From Swiss-Prot:
Keywords recorded for this protein, A-Z: Cell membrane, Kinase, Membrane, Phosphoprotein, Sugar transport, Symport, Transferase, Transmembrane, Transmembrane helix, Transport
GO cellular-component term (any): plasma membrane
Known function: Responsible for transport of beta-galactosides into the cell, with the concomitant uptake of protons (symport system), and also for transport of homologous and heterologous exchange of beta-galactosides.
Source species taxonomy: Bacteria, Bacillati, Bacillota, Bacilli, Lactobacillales
PTS EIIA type-1 domain ranges (all copies): 493-597
Protein name as annotated: Lactose permease
Length: 627
């Protein structure tokens, strides 16, 4: 237990450091570039640098598949992922620190040389951060085969990530002002920004090392793959999966909207309100609100469904933009508007994340093959493209409004304020309206639709393997659970009652522990963990299905201790379910056990009478003779 806790806390520390770094890179570095890197009025160099940053960030997207493939091929004594997490974390942190300098003043004396060096260092930083980020988030399946432990680790990571992303906003102004030689500028001076970057770099390095020392990768042949991912494949999957495509479009516009407004908030508090400390107060509130908001997602999604929750999130964000836009010089009203805008963001992100995850099965049903890694890679791709473009918008807005080196709230003209407010409030509002319009018209992959798809995939698998010959003259099947024995024709589902997925038996479960009835291989495991297919050495395929309609629960109340491709021993616990969760959802908890390719046998018989109470691993069903 202590080892698991250390692993969770270490991974949470890694998530904290990862988001501290990303928040600095994606939001605050552009503020440094526009307000401190060059002399007042040097708009040309600022424009060149921001365009260079945008080009590098978009170009780096082309390298992402190569980065993923390099990580997949890594073999070391420390595992597959940790070398990249630790090494990438150290190198990217040091490179980021260097970017918060003027390289000895050559940005003024030798601008062309500076641009070349800046581009090289930025590219190194961006590539190694991508190695670290990709390796870090890909680690979760490698830390445990237990789905419950993975979920706990993910929860710890979400907490660390939320705190990291928001804490930067809390401390950035106090840190910069504390270390600045001059306090005249609301955003400090170069010295203050350097010490802020130094702290970020130290956090990035220490948390990366913490992940390396505190986590342990579970060696599994299941994750070994020689298949290479290419950007062409990603776009091919998008073209074949209309739900993924339209959701990606909606999410791209959504990301442009929220990223642009979020990145402009420090400018707003510094140059419109003239109170940069108000920004720290805002992110202090955001830190706690973000943790609370995300915790309500399961209950809100269950009550309203995900699509309606997304609409509600956009409505509240638009309300927040409206309040924010009329706040004028009021700090209190600005904070109210900013919070209305922020509160729904974690919820909307989780809606998108869940639908993208469900799009894996949608694409599988539509194309006949499963593209999980490619499908899940779409969100980071959209995030990077949207983040690069929103950063570019921010730099143009800052230049146009005059919020550059030497500017203060008193030097911003009325025209500059008007341009800034239009860009900060009107542009994101339009982006959100476009996003919700696409979502409403094109995205129909609800929880109910996904549950239907999961059941259809299970039926397809059974029908496609029904005629697979078993290399055995007879087969005796033990019960995987304890409970009361039933005939299949007593099951309230025609697919099972009519033996469309093979002959077998059913049980009213006495508890939620599910054991492997024989030694074999996990051929299929539903993402919702409510069904599993095992195959023994003779090619006999057995389906264990927990409850009726339980795919709707989307994994809630179900735990898996194995994954597809796992080798299991007879009597090994493979699944567990919490019966009250099924009954609370008013669903049938009957456990169905069928031999998918039972048609290859001539005869079947029950070894125990119907209604008999059986213990897990008792022999209850036999097939013999060859058809």
């Amino acid at each position: 237990m202590k080892k698991k806790l250390v692993s969770r806390l270490s991974y949470a520390a890694g998530a904290f450091g990862n988001d501290v770094f990303y928040a600095t890179l994606s939001t605050y570095f552009i503020v440094f570039v526009t307000t401190h890197l060059f002399n007042a009025g040097d708009h040309k160099m600022i424009f060149i640098i921001t365009n260079l940053i945008t080009a590098i960030r978009i170009g780096e997207v082309l390298l992402d598949p190569l980065i993923g493939n390099a990580i997949d091929r890594t073999e070391s004594r420390w595992g597959k992922f940790k070398p990249w997490v630790v090494g990438g974390g150290i190198i990217s942190s040091l490179a980021l620190l260097a970017l918060f300098t003027d390289f000895g003043g050559i940005n003024q004396s030798k601008p062309v040389v500076y641009l070349v060096i800046f581009g090289i260092v930025y590219l190194i930083m961006d590539i190694f951060y991508s190695f670290k980020d990709t390796g870090f988030w890909a680690m979760i399946p490698a830390l445990s085969l237990d789905s419950r432990e993975r979920e706990k680790t993910s929860t710890f990571a979400r907490v660390g990530s939320t705190i990291g992303a928001n804490l930067v906003g809390v401390v950035i102004t106090p840190i910069i002002l504390f270390f600045s030689a001059s306090k005249a500028n609301p955003n400090g001076d170069k010295q203050g920004w350097f010490f802020f970057a130094l702290i970020v770099a130290i956090v990035g390095i220490l948390t990366s090392i913490t992940v390396g020392l505190g986590t342990h990768e579970v060696k599994s042949a299941l994750r070994e793959s020689n298949e290479k991912t290419t950007l062409k494949q990603v776009f091919k999957v998008l073209g074949q999966n209309d739900q993924l495509l339209w959701l990606a479009f909606a999410y791209w516009f959504y990301g442009l909207g929220i990223n642009t407004l979020n990145a402009l908030q420090l400018y707003y508090f510094s140059y419109i309100l003239g109170d940069a400390r108000g920004y720290s107060l805002l992110y202090t509130i955001n830190t706690f609100v973000g943790l609370i908001s995300a915790s309500f997602f399961p209950s809100l999604a269950k009550k309203f469904n995900r699509n309606r929750l997304f609409y509600a999130c956009i409505a509240v964000m638009l309300l927040g933009i409206g309040v924010f836009s009329v706040a004028s010089g009021s700090l209190a009203l600005s904070l109210v508007g900013a919070e209305f805008f922020f509160i729904p963001q974690p919820l909307a992100f989780l809606v998108v994340l869940m639908i993208i995850s469900d799009a894996v099965e949608y694409g599988q049903l539509k194309t006949g093959h499963r593209d999980e890694a490619l499908t899940l890679s779409v969100r980071p791709l959209v995030d990077k493209l949207g983040g690069a473009l929103s950063n570019w918008f921010v730099s143009l807005i800052a230049l146009t409004a005059g919020m550059t080196t030497g500017a203060t709230a008193s030097t911003i003209t009325a025209h500059g304020q008007m341009v800034f407010k239009l860009a900060m409030f009107a542009l994101p509002a339009v982006m959100l309206l476009i996003a919700v319009s696409i979502f409403a018209k094109k995205v129909f992959l609800t929880e109910e639709k996904h549950a239907e798809i999961v059941d259809q995939l299970e039926t397809q698998f059974g029908q496609s393997h029904a005629q697979k010959p078993a290399q055995a003259e007879s087969f005796t099947l033990a019960s995987p659970v304890s409970g009361q024995l039933m005939n299949l024709d007593m099951v309230d589902d025609p697919v099972f009652a009519d033996k469309k997925l093979g002959d077998g038996f059913a049980l009213v479960p006495a508890d939620g522990k599910v054991y492997a009835p024989f030694a074999g291989t996990v051929r299929q495991l539903a993402k919702t963990r409510h069904s599993i297919v095992l195959e023994n050495e003779h090619g006999v395929l057995v389906l264990i299905h927990l409850g009726l309609g339980t795919a709707k629960l989307n994994g809630t109340g179900f735990v898996s201790y194995v994954e597809e491709g796992s080798q299991v021993e007879a009597g090994q616990q493979i699944l567990e379910f919490w019966d009250p969760a099924i009954k609370q959802a008013k669903l049938d908890d009957t456990v169905i056990v069928t031999v998918i390719n039972s048609e290859t046998f001539a005869n079947s018989q029950m070894l125990l009478p119907i209604g008999h109470s059986v213990q897990a691993l008792d022999d209850v069903f036999k097939l013999e003779g060859k058809n």
